[in-house]
């Protein structure tokens, strides 16, 4: 009987060691080397900020788009993680889009930008993993290095109005 128990114990130990890892479910939203580079490099030239009409040609916002401060702009709510307190990576993020009036949200205009001395578009790192809907999105396993990270989220509606939300993530 004892050899059978020892064999079962080895089997359970092997299964627990070779089981799925939490690391397999995470992805680098921003790597440590990127955060360092984006926060220390000087841009070669100033970028022009634009309030261009997003209704024209089904255009989408850029990391340098600014809203026209209209109260009727769509809203972006960050439901998780809780902002304003220390966080640990990996992060799960719940983002909700709130349309105004009868204009529907255009999910194809969703944009996430890392804002440092150099601004970088991170959208594809998220949209390759999750689907963005008119209601919002849920991201799991976003890895960020320790430090303070500024993200800018943008979304437009069918009338071309731009919603903008900034988030500061303090990772410890």
Q: Language-model segments: which ranges?
A:
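Surface-exposed, short loops/turns at beta-strand junctions within beta-sandwich domains
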Residues: 141-148
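Short beta-strand edge segments in extracellular beta-sheet folds
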Residues: 168-172
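Short, compositionally biased P/S/T/A/G/V-rich stretches that sit at domain boundaries
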Residues: 24-92
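Short edge beta-strand/loop segments characteristic of extracellular beta-sandwich folds
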Residues: 92-101
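Solvent-exposed loop/turn segments flanking beta-strands in beta-repeat/beta-sandwich domains
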Residues: 100-112
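Aromatic sugar-binding surface patches on proteins
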Residues: 130-138
